[in-house]
Structure formats: C-alpha cells, structure tokens
C-alpha cells in the first residue's frame, strides 16, 4: 500500500508499506523549514505594486513526490516561503494569469531557515487591456506574439480589471491578440514596461 499524509500545505509524507497478517506500525518523520530572501531584476528595474500584485515566488519539486509552495513578494522584493519539506526545489517567479513562469534558481532546504537571494532575468510586461470603447477586457485569454518571430509566443488570461503580467525573456515588439483581433503592440527595450492596450479599429 502507498500511505500519503497530507495537511493544509499539501503532501507531508508518502511511503509504501507492506501489510501481511499482522498489524503494522509506521512512524513518519516530517521535517520542514522556510526560505527567506530577496528578488531583484537583472535589468535594473524596481518592483512596483503591479509586480507584487501579479507575481509570486514558487518552489516546486517532482521527487520523491510532487510538492510545491507559493508566497507573495513584498514591495522591496523580499519574500518568505514557509512550511517547505526538506529537499531540493526549483525556484520560480510565477506570473498570475499567465504561462510565462521564470526559473530563477534551485535551493536545497535542509534546515529550519534558509536564506538566499535570486535575480530575475527577463522583462516584466504589465498590461491593462480595453476594448475600443475603453471597457476592460475581463477574463479573456490572449496570445502575446513576437512580431519578428511568430514561434515566440506566450498566452495569458486577464483578471477582473482586464489586467495581466507576463515575464518575457528578450527585448522586442510583441502584439497582443484575442483570436484574430489585435489589441496593439508593446515594445520592450531594456526595462520592465507598463502599458494600456486598446482594441485596434477595423
């Protein structure tokens, strides 16, 4: 049998046991710690309210069983991720409503408190998307396409204010598309960008 122990923070322990013709007693040692540190942008941009509202820091591992944790990012880029089972994790910056999560490193949690800073490569694109009359495009899935390389595309969903945040890996001009309709372009050069995009007139 596979025995899994779960709590409010997810899977705490999982192990296979064999039951024959007698009672079985099994103890599980659950060790967990926390990660503290600070995120900075490689491009020199500062964190904004938009960044910290729309992005989180996440830890994820696959072995010996899947486990993940998420935590908010503070205005100065600092974070504290609690209740992390001992083990080695990928550290990600996760953009809300998007599929453009960015790996910023790995960390091994093997003590009560671990401290490490991480640098985010790439560029944040903060968008508020409205229709031709200025109404927010709520809960819509857009594609975000590099105009010079159509294979470089990402997808994101807007929130209840028509807003979204993506982290892209390289500068360029990108077009936001809802199905076959254009909602304008964003040009990224050397810093994070915040824009309002409006549906193009036919």
Language-model features: locations:
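Short, ordered, surface-exposed loop/turn motifs in non-cytosolic proteins
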Residues: 41-65, 131-150, 170-171
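Surface-exposed coil/turn segments at beta-strand junctions on protein surfaces, enriched
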Residues: 19-21, 28-30, 50, 72-74, ...
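A short, amphipathic beta-strand motif
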Residues: 28, 35-42, 118, 125-131, ...
């Amino acid at each position: 049998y596979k025995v899994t122990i779960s709590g409010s923070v997810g899977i705490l322990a999982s192990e296979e046991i064999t039951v024959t013709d007698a009672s079985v007693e099994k103890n599980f040692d659950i060790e967990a710690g926390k990660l503290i540190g600070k995120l900075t942008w490689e491009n020199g941009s500062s964190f904004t309210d938009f960044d910290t509202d729309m992005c989180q820091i996440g830890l994820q591992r696959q072995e010996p069983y899947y486990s993940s944790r998420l935590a908010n990012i503070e205005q100065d880029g600092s974070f504290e991720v609690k209740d992390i089972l001992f083990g080695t994790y990928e550290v990600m910056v996760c953009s809300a409503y998007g599929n453009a999560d960015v790996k910023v490193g790995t960390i091994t949690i093997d003590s009560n408190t671990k401290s490490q800073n991480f640098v985010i490569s790439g560029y944040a694109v903060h968008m508020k998307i409205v229709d031709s009359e200025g109404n927010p495009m709520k809960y819509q899935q857009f594609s975000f396409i590099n105009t010079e390389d159509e294979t470089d595309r990402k997808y994101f969903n807007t929130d209840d204010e028509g807003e979204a945040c993506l982290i892209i890996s390289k500068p360029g001009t990108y077009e936001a598309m809802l199905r076959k309709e254009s909602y304008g372009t964003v040009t990224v050069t050397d810093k994070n960008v915040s824009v309002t995009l409006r549906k193009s007139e036919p």
